[in-house]
Amino acid sequence: MVQLNQNFINTIAQELPAHLSMDDFIAACSRPLRRSIRVNTLKISSEDFKQLMLPKGWTFEPIPWCEDGFWISYDEEEQLGNALEHIQGLFYIQEASSMLPPTALFTPNADWQCVLDLASAPGSKTTQMAALMNNQGLLVANEYSASRVKVLHANVLRMGASHCALTHFDGRVFGEYLYESFDAVLIDAPCGGEGTVRKDADALKSWSLDEVLEISETQKALIESAFLALKPGGSLVYSTCTLNRHENQGVCEYLQQTYGDAVQFESLSQLFDGAEKATTPEGFLHVWPQIYDSEGFFVAKLTKTRSVPRLQPEPKLQKNFPFTEASAKQAKAIQAYFADDLGIKLPDDLIMVRDDEFWLFPHEFRDFIGKMRFQRIGVKLADHSKHGFKVRHEAIIALAGKALTAGAANGAKVVDVSDEQAKEYLMGRDIPLDTAGKAQGEVIVCYGGAPLGMAKHLGNKLKNSLPRDLVKDKVLLLPPQA
């Protein structure tokens, strides 16, 4: 049973718009959330995904504000996180409201080249933006919590987002170190979580106004840092999964009071059909849970109309960046390996070398070298030794993508497996082959047109090359429904 703190109810009663009912709000908070997912278009189109899942008993209701988002129904005993299609990265389990901020940031401009996600983990919005960018440009994804950085990296890897650079900093430093560096910034701020009560019945059990006010001070510092990191003419989206004015409108008003006409709020009333139901007088979206039968959420968008003074002197460039640009000979060798042995044409990005490692960075990353320490950049392509190149799992997941079928026609060594074989592979087991043949060496294991990873073809079996940390204890095969 949902427990709503009386102090919270009293506060919300003063803020709830006149056309909305408090009884409807409480009733909505007491209902379970509708299940929702976002199709990962880096790997599969929404239409192809629906055709894949409809025979398995899924039904799809479009989410109005996300072209690739759907409310779904299916056998609720199934643990979707274990589903083969989820492990493959074909979809992300994402609450519908949380799809709003990336949509707001990329509408109407979908051509941002340098984007910052200031508070990224676990990665739903990061990977949504990576798909909207179609793995072009540079997406810097920051997370302050060390344990959550690992989760973020795992999701970026699973979804095949190749143009991300991960950082692990307090978000308040970005205005100083990466001053006016980004075309667009998303800050989905840490918050009181009042909108999440439908999935966490105890979220508001110990709600207090003092804690709200304390959090709002952190949010003000974060939005100011994000604004300073934004280029003039760029767009910033600020969002929370909370409902009170202190953490929402109050934070946006603080920024405008601080920077005056450099802050221009953009109305979101036309973002999607029905957006006006949640639009505030300022043009923000204040999504109460009863409006769209979703989590509570807040989204604001602004344009930075002019440059503003930096608050700190420009930091010195950091030395000893461990990567160097590949020589023409090195670049040609790694390109030939991917093309000839794997049937994959490498994108026209920066090929970088560190010791015997070959990496692929976005071109846009050049401007960021030495300005900040990055946990992870781009994609590790391969290791090189006297025996030649050995491709890395993440490169196959990120770069093979939807091109595998075409790649096979171009000479790629691809082995298509059944669903049962795919399950065995993801659980770390070797796959016996029905007929023995000539050993083919390294091959790409593929299921349903999307890569699972690498294996060594020994003639009578596929020797599993899946990294040990990605081996699953359980893989769910969703059965066809009559």
Swiss-Prot record:
SUPFAM superfamilies assigned to the protein according to its UniProt record, in alphabetical order: S-adenosyl-L-methionine-dependent methyltransferases
Full protein name: Ribosomal RNA small subunit methyltransferase F
Catalysed reaction, written as an equation: cytidine(1407) in 16S rRNA + S-adenosyl-L-methionine = 5-methylcytidine(1407) in 16S rRNA + S-adenosyl-L-homocysteine + H(+)
Sequence similarity: Belongs to the class I-like SAM-binding methyltransferase superfamily. RsmB/NOP family.
Active site: 241 (nucleophile)
One Pfam short name: Methyltr_RsmF_N
GO CC aspect terms: cytoplasm
UniProt keyword annotations, A-Z: Cytoplasm, Methyltransferase, RNA-binding, rRNA processing, S-adenosyl-L-methionine, Transferase
Residues binding S-adenosyl-L-methionine, per UniProt: 119-125, 143, 170, 188
Subcellular location: Cytoplasm
Keyword Nuclease: no
One BP term from GO: rRNA base methylation
GO molecular function: RNA binding; rRNA (cytosine-C5-)-methyltransferase activity
Signal sequence interval, chain numbering: none
InterPro entries: Methyltr_RsmF_N, MeTrfase_RsmB-F_NOP2_cat, MeTrfase_RsmB-F_NOP2_dom, Nol1_Nop2_Fmu_2, Nop2p, RCMT, rRNA_ssu_MeTfrase_F, SAM-dependent_MTases_sf
Encoding gene, per UniProt annotation: rsmF
Enzyme Commission number(s) of this protein: 2.1.1.178
Domain of life: Bacteria
Function per UniProt: Specifically methylates the cytosine at position 1407 (m5C1407) of 16S rRNA.
